[in-house]
């Protein structure tokens, strides 16, 4: 049995660890561990403190991170007291824990109902309005004091932070600021400094600028950072002192907010009992991978405000609400090995071999580690236990060590595992690259990417066959694929068993030759593709499908693309300096020029599906609600018709395509005089546009 001194030391160690994590999470926007690891550690601390409270003075117990919200404010923003504490939420990890929480509410009110909604993984923000004008915007801070980030809140799109509302009484509303996953993916092309959408939202919202720079070369970065506020979105979920506004329930509160023009999560429900609650939690859990924003659980609230005072609160969280966490996406296993692989851009990815374990219904034996800094921060040790998590990713990620270690016992890889060239660090210092253009692995991965589904879609050229063709000297680049038809004799010879040399006479009987002929037919078909697919297939660093589609509006073939002034695209369509620099570097590279020269001789017949100039679009569309097909399909139809699509409503929006469970866009569209259409009307418009 542990001595009291050992238990006290353990509690102090856990407190220091959590304080450090809190500081990095709340103040530096740089989380050191995954939420699930944090929650497990906090629960361990809470349990030890409950069982051994006598080892500490009352003052020491009150100063524990288990009793406080957030972290000490260290930023330069004005520190302002909250009108009422901005508390955190207690957590439940099982149905039994949720039932235990609900029991107290049922004892006070037998007919109690509940309100359930996803728990957005964002940044808590409290907005204050006087005479309908936004006058203050406070972050959570330490729960008692927050940072007044009004100067930044005013830069966020009106759709997500209303600057004026049609309500003259003093009003305080609270919600979450977040960046959706698709927007974050675009943002990551411009900067690698954000680890996840929450980290990005916090970094942008709490960005401190105490002056406006002169208009010179240095101002460019400032202006680009200012434009980042367009990425921020919101969901608001509660009022402070709702009874003052004659609002008696959480359900009424969200309707009140929606009617005032605030974004309210449409995926929510008033539940009559716990059975209804559990059913809705199951629905949220099933659908969360299809949401375009991250959630880290579900919030369950007592719906009736009348019993909130009787339910009370602790210094850290209210008893009127609880967060139900999804814990079954985390598993414990053993880290067996770490090895590095090289991608088509030369970027190094660290991979983990783990002891097989079942996670989210699948048997897992490998996991991904983004870079060496990640391994260092988590202090991962080979042949020790680790936590792995699967939340929408195909390959799960290691999120922490089960036990504490002073440092990792795995050394950084310094040379390319394929060509042995010395690896070079990126400007950020996070990523490593092999810069040998003749590295066999880079060449292989470039060709694999070139043939992939979203590029030229040559199914018969999977990675193993490409490896074989490279090994036999049949190809050395992606362009060589189009000239395989001129090497039939060589293919027959080099891919055949020496003892059973294939000839033209018996070739027709060979399954292998049939396979080759199928491949050649696919290669010929690949000459008739949308131009954006070839752009994507080139594998230009930081140029994904979205950027490739945009580029195809400005160039209809390789020759036009090579002569395009990419600087003209700066700050348009989310094209920032990182993408522009990548494009310029790619087209100035001698080896790439040789590849492009070859591709220009292939004889592509590109389809014309995108406008060469978006300013000539015949209409502008926005979408709200759930439609009969995936949203991406409608965006594709809109763009291919020659129209433009925007996530948010703007002055230039002509049509709002409305689906089920539409949000506040419908009210904004009505006020702005934007025509609201259903799916039938939408397809009629598209059909008629093709006739003109």
From Swiss-Prot:
Catalytic activity line of the entry: NAD(+) + (deoxyribonucleotide)n-3'-hydroxyl + 5'-phospho-(deoxyribonucleotide)m = (deoxyribonucleotide)n+m + AMP + beta-nicotinamide D-nucleotide
Any single Pfam family the record assigns to this protein: BRCT
Binding site for Zn(2+): 416, 419, 434, 439
SMART domains: BRCT, LIGANc
Molecular functions per Gene Ontology: DNA ligase (NAD+) activity; metal ion binding
Binding-site positions, NAD(+): 35-39, 88-89, 117, 140, 176, 301, 325
EC code: 6.5.1.2
GO terms under biological process: DNA repair; DNA replication
UniProtKB keywords: DNA damage, DNA repair, DNA replication, Ligase, Magnesium, Manganese, Metal-binding, NAD, Zinc
Active site: 119
Role, per record: DNA ligase that catalyzes the formation of phosphodiester linkages between 5'-phosphoryl and 3'-hydroxyl groups in double-stranded DNA using NAD as a coenzyme and as the energy source for the reaction. It is essential for DNA replication and repair of damaged DNA.
Stated name of the protein: DNA ligase
Species of provenance: Mesomycoplasma hyopneumoniae (strain 232)
């Amino acid at each position: 049995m542990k001595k009291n001194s050992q238990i006290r030391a353990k509690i102090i160690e856990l407190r220091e660890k959590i304080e450090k994590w809190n500081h990095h999470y709340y103040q530096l926007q740089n989380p050191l561990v995954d939420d699930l690891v944090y929650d497990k550690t906090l629960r361990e601390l809470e349990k030890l403190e409950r069982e051994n409270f006598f080892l500490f003075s009352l003052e020491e117990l009150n100063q524990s991170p288990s009793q406080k919200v957030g972290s000490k404010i260290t930023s330069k923003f004005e520190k302002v007291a909250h009108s009422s504490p901005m508390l955190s939420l207690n957590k439940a990890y099982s149905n039994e824990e949720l039932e235990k929480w609900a029991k107290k509410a049922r004892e006070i009110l037998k007919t109690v109902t509940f309100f359930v909604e996803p728990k957005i993984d964002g940044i808590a923000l409290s907005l204050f309005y006087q005479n309908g004008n936004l006058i203050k915007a406070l972050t959570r801070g330490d729960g008692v004091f927050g940072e007044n980030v009004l100067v930044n809140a005013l830069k966020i799109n009106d759709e997500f932070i209303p600057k004026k509302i049609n309500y003259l009484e003093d009003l305080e509303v609270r919600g979450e600021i977040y960046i959706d996953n698709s927007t974050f993916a675009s943002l990551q092309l411009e900067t690698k400094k954000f680890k996840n959408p929450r980290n990005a939202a916090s970094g942008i919202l709490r960005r401190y600028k105490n002056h406006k720079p002169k208009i010179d070369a240095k101002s460019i970065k400032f202006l680009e950072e200012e434009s980042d506020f367009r990425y921020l979105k919101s969901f608001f979920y509660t009022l402070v002192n709702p009874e003052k506004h004659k609002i008696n329930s959480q359900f009424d509160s969200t309707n009140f907010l929606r009617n005032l023009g605030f974004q309210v999560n449409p995926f929510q429900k008033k539940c009559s009992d716990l059975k209804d609650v559990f059913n809705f939690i199951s629905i949220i859990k099933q659908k969360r991978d299809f949401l375009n924003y991250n959630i880290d659980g579900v919030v369950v609230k007592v719906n009736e405000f009348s019993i909130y005072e009787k339910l009370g609160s602790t210094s850290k969280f209210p008893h009127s609400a609880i967060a139900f966490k999804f814990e079954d996406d985390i598993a414990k296993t053993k880290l067996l090995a770490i090895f590095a692989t090289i991608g088509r851009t030369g970027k190094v990815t660290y991979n983990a071999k783990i002891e097989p374990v079942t996670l989210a219904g699948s048997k897992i034996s490998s996991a991904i580690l983004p870079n060496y800094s990640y391994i260092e921060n988590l202090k991962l040790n080979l042949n020790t236990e680790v936590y792995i998590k699967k939340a929408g990713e195909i390959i799960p990620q290691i999120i922490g060590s089960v036990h504490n270690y002073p440092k990792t016992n795995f050394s950084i890889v310094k040379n390319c595992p394929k060509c042995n060239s010395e690896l070079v660090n990126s400007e950020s210092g996070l990523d490593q690259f092999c810069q040998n253009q003749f590295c066999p692995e880079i060449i292989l991965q470039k060709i694999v990417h070139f043939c992939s589904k979203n590029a030229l879609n040559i199914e018969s050229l999977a990675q193993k066959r490409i490896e074989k063709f490279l090994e036999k000297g049949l190809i050395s680049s992606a362009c060589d694929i189009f000239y395989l038809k001129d090497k039939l004799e060589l293919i027959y010879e080099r891919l055949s068993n020496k003892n059973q040399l294939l000839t033209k006479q018996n070739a027709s009987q060979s399954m292998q030759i049939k396979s080759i002929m199928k491949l050649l037919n696919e290669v010929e078909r690949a000459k008739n593709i949308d131009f954006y697919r070839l752009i994507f297939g080139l594998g230009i660093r930081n140029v994904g499908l979205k950027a490739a589609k945009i580029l195809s509006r400005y160039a209809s073939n390789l020759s036009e693309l090579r002569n395009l002034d990419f600087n003209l695209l700066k700050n348009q369509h989310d094209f920032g300096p990182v993408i522009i620099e990548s494009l310029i570097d790619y087209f100035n590279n001698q080896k790439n020029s040789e590849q492009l020269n070859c591709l220009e001789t292939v004889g592509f017949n590109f389809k014309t599906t995108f406008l060469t100039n978006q300013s000539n679009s015949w209409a502008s569309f926005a979408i709200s609600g759930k439609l009969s097909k995936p949203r991406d399909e409608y965006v594709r139809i809109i763009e291919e018709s020659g129209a433009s699509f925007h996530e948010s409503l703007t002055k230039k929006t002509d049509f709002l395509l409305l689906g089920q469970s539409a949000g506040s866009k419908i009210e904004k569209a009505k006020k702005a005089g934007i025509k609201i259409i259903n799916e039938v009307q939408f397809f009629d418009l598209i059909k008629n546009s093709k006739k003109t």
